[in-house]
Amino acid sequence: MNRVIPTLLSCAVAFASMEAMAAADLVLINGNIFTADHARPKVQALAVQDGKVLQVGSDAQIKVLIEPSTRVINLAGKTLMPGLIDSHSHAIFGGLELASANMGDEQVSLDELEKRLRGWREDGKAKHGDVLSVAGMSSAYWAQAEAFAQRFNQGEWAQVPIVFIGSDHHTAWANNVMLTRAGIDATLINTLPAAERDTIGRLANGAPNGFLVDAGWDRVASVMPKASPADLLRAAQAALRFNNSLGITAWMDPAANAAPGEPVFALKPTEKTVGVLPVYKALSETGAMSAHVAALLVANPRSRPADLDTLDSVRKQFQDIPNLSLPGIKIFADGVLEFPAQSAALINPYNNSHKQGELLIDPAHFGELVSAADQRGWLVHIHAIGDRAVRESLNGIEQARKDRQSGVTHSITHLQLVNPKEFARFKPLNVIASMQLLWASADEYTLDMIKPYVSALAFRYQYPAHSLLKQGATIAGASDWPVSSPNPFNAMAQAITRVGPKGVLNAAEGIDRETMFYAYTVNAARTIGLEQRIGSLEPGKQADFIIVDRDVFKVDEKALHDTRVLSTWFAGREVYAPAAH
């Protein structure tokens, strides 16, 4: 009898399991399916129940789950992947720019730029209150600051506030009307600390020339007309549609407590500094939020542990909102690398200025801040572009790891210059490299605005994806949209080839496509703190997936770049399909 009871119990359990698994409401068969599960990366078929993955396997294994009520889709060999995840996207800012005047990093003559400004003034795309603003400006323009002044401080523009915003969103140029509105003049500049003076371009006589970077740009951004709540909700809806069309079903917003026009680089948050969080809440309440958003709160780089209480009061205002999580904080360790901004923090000085950029964090206390966040179970996501900023960011995380092994995954984003001594530190510190590898290109940015100004060693290890990977680092995909396109397939192809208009940017740092497929799925899910729910097609995880128009494992890099999404599914429901496919 003792042997009979276990046998009966096991049969009952098996029968119950079959019953539970027999209620698939959606089955997709005959596919080329990438699961992003390292234990079982490729399968033929997928079963979905109540918005979650029920099972994956062969056609034969999954067909037994089909009932009369089950919707069955024959993929006919098409490729299916998990929904893609962007580990660094300012999506609502991007949504605003979709409907606004934008140069898209294109360079044209000042005559043509002025012509476009007139056109955007007439159609309203450049108008924000009484200010004319154009986004997406190439950093190559900033060497012409004085020519901009001659053009846009007189004639028809003499009384019109104008701002040209860099595609990097760290730099801008403002005319005299706008500078006056922001209170920026020679007198102000002379009262600023030396580091902050360097964030405002100056003429020989000490007057501002209109060029702004980081904290200098904050001063002008703070007096720009604010977008209305309705405008922001429309921007969020546009961003959601656009991301879904690219196969993106989750992203991490790294500055969710800062709204457009609010200072970011010198942010001193209060419990009322809620940024775009109310917009995400409103979007969720419409029932149409077809993406997971992990919203980070920007902490001032010089914050102390007690300051986290203020951010926690913000977090508590936005709990239990479907598809919105608040997993941690974002910190700026430095600025940007390109000439003339050069605010990224370097180990060796810039060749022209002999300065080392601006390290925004305080190395003596940064570890205390990271450790305090880690103790709360918060992930820390750090903007670090220069090699010194990367080193000090790792040092801060190292302090947290010495204090405890929390299991919280922290990340460093951008990683434009990384000293080789840092490569082997990422894995043992459990730090993910959140990289915008679309930027790994031999172009005017890397060759004209960076190479002449940094050491040969620093330049050699620019966006060093392969070197990091070789030392065991985990890479997550990221775009920094609207700084550049959020299209993951563009970034995947670029990470492989590193080809640009001026050649190849250190071909040795190229990585393979499968690494990039994991970077935009399970690795990115870890980065944003949602790896238990999304990122791979495994039983119990949410059924977020995409179907694409080609076999991304076999096509060449050009074809990979041009991949189109045929449909995007969120929680087992189709949320995007082009008009015809």
Model-derived regions, located:
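Bacterial N-terminal signal peptides that target proteins for export
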Residues: 1-8
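N-terminal signal peptide c-region/cleavage motif recognized by signal peptidases
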Residues: 17-19
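Divalent metal-binding segments
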Residues: 23-29, 34, 38-312, 327, ...
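Active-site neighborhood of phospho(di)ester-bond hydrolases with catalytic His/Asp-centered motifs
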Residues: 81-87, 413-414, 434, 476-479
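Conserved beta-strand positions in the central sheet of alpha/beta enzyme cores
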Residues: 252, 330, 413, 434-435, ...
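Acidic (Asp/Glu)-rich catalytic clusters
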Residues: 283-287, 314-324, 426-428
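Short, conserved secondary-structure transition motifs
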Residues: 300-304, 413-422
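His/Asp/Glu-enriched, well-ordered alpha-helical/loop segment
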Residues: 371-381, 385-410, 420, 424, ...
